[in-house]
Regions:
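Conserved Rossmann-fold NAD(P)-dependent oxidoreductase catalytic core, especially the SDR/UDP-sugar
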Residues: 171-213, 235
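NAD(P)H-binding glycine-rich loop region in Rossmannoid oxidoreductase-like domains
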Residues: 120-164
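Amphipathic terminal alpha-helices
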Residues: 62-67, 372-380, 384-421
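NAD(P)-dependent short-chain dehydrogenase/reductase
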Residues: 228-277, 282-284, 291, 322
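N-terminal Rossmann NAD(P)H-binding glycine-rich loop of SDR-like oxidoreductase domains
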Residues: 74-92
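Active-site Tyr-X1-5-Lys
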Residues: 211-235
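Mid/C-terminal beta-alpha module of Rossmann-like enzyme folds, strongest
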Residues: 291-357, 374, 390, 394-395, ...
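Conserved C-terminal active-site "lid" loop/helix of NAD(P)H-dependent oxidoreductases
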Residues: 282, 344-384
Length: 421
């Protein structure tokens, strides 16, 4: 009986970094993740680790020329995911891309010539993948785009956050020590920050305050990267909720679905309806990655960036905009007490055909508000989002109205709940 959807969007994929993308191993280590302060802010000392290339401008390496000569080698983890696929579409054949991912079903192969099987939860698999990069003659890496991570709304916590997101990052960093690496980009999330109040704007120095295992694992991974990076420049991208013209945002999809099906649950909310979260369109997200790679030589050695739209729609504004597009009229959203919402959510889960997305633990997050100050990304990258969720909603909704079954299937919704037209 609650719709706390807009309270904790990510990069999905980053935003859909679920374990089927990663080929998880049962041999994963299960050490406890520790959440500490932001190492970027406290000047954590560097240890001997990855080696930055010393030949950034001489063009000596003929086998893997630098990007300045027209090609450069990129390693993209999670390359068959939504963000990875969109990035590969964007860069085309400009670079030599090494896609680290699971080969075969259930996902189509990444759109790159070199697809290398890599299970981040396995030491052997990660090192074998890097050995294959070496065998292909690529010792000098222009940029590592580390997009793969574990992510799921199924539960508040999971050992896979530690095994994949944290220890998988550690395996990758250790394996890269034999390479010359010009840049390491880590896809993090806005949820590492404590929420703000409407009218305030979160910047990169805003206090940390992750509330569940997904953002907690990102904080731990960020700090691990800063400890183990050696002299390799790193970019920590803290990303808003990623969506595209077909939606592909789990919480946003669920919100649209409830209003489309005219469910009563779509009219109630356990949080402050004047609060909302930051989104970013996939094309703008990818552009930020491209610009970070292109500007890697001018960026500080440790760069934290918030990537999201400047405008944050409140939950109520989003409800009204969706209902106008779907039904030609605005819905009124009613706020209910959190204890009642948790009880209703639990009772609903016992019913046949219950909404599998809503969980009682989400209700405590429903008041969270995220609004970005993106001036650092503007200054360092020259990045400016060209899309807004407000202007993109008509395209998203029209896609649903023109082909409900296809839209449901593409967004992994149960088609049996589609209302009769």
């Amino acid at each position: 009986m609650v719709a706390p959807l807009s309270s904790f969007f990510t990069s999905a994929t980053i935003v859909r970094g679920i374990k089927e993308h990663l080929g998880l191993s049962t041999r994963s280590c299960k050490r406890q993740a520790a959440i500490g302060r932001d190492a970027a802010d406290i000047g954590m000392p560097q240890r001997s680790g990855l080696h930055a290339t010393n030949e950034r401008n001489d063009g000596v390496m003929n086998k893997t020329p630098t990007i300045q000569n027209g090609l450069g080698t990129l390693i993209i983890t999670g390359s068959s995911g939504l963000i990875g696929s969109a990035f590969l579409d964007r860069v085309g054949e400009s670079y030599t891309e090494m896609g680290f991912d699971r080969k075969g079903p259930p996902h189509p192969p990444p759109k790159t010539e070199h697809v290398i099987a890599c299970d981040l939860s396995s030491d052997e698999s990660v090192y074998a993948a890097l050995d294959e990069v070496r065998r292909l003659g690529h010792r000098r890496i222009a940029s590592i785009l580390h997009l793969a991570a574990y992510y799921s709304f199924a539960s508040e916590s999971s050992p896979l956050y530690e095994q994949v997101t944290v220890r998988g990052t550690e395996r990758l960093l250790l394996g890269l020590r034999d390479f010359e690496v010009e840049q390491f980009i880590f896809a993090s999330t806005m949820l590492v920050h404590a929420p703000c109040e409407p009218g305030e704007r979160i910047d990169e120095d805003w206090p940390l305050g992750p509330k569940w295992d997904y953002p907690k694992s990102k904080v731990t991974a960020e700090q691990l990267i800063l400890r183990e990076r050696g002299d390799v420049p790193v970019v920590l991208m803290r990303i808003g909720g990623v969506y595209d013209d077909r939606c592909h945002s789990i919480p946003l999809t669920q919100q649209i679905k409830r209003i489309y099906e005219k469910r009563f649950i779509g009219r109630i909310f356990s949080g402050d309806i004047t609060h909302g979260v930051t989104f970013v369109h996939m094309e703008d997200m990818v552009e930020a990655l491209v610009l970070a790679v292109e500007h890697r030589k001018e960026l500080p050695h440790v760069t934290t960036l918030l990537i999201g739209e400047s405008e944050t729609l409140s939950y109520d504004e989003l409800q009204r905009a969706i209902s106008r597009q779907l039904h030609g009229k605005e819905w009124t959203t009613y706020q209910i007490p959190k204890p009642l919402a948790k009880l209703g959510c639990w009772l609903q889960s016992l019913l046949p055909g219950a909404d599998p997305f809503l969980k009682p633990w989400m209700i405590d997050l429903s008041d969270d508000h995220y609004e970005f100050d993106i001036s650092r990304a503007r200054t360092l990258l020259g990045w400016e989002p060209r899309h807004t969720l407000r202007k993109s909603l008509p395209t998203i909704i029209n896609g649903l109205k023109s082909d409900p079954a296809g839209w449901y299937q593409e967004n992994k919704l149960r088609t049996k709940t589609i209302p009769d037209q």
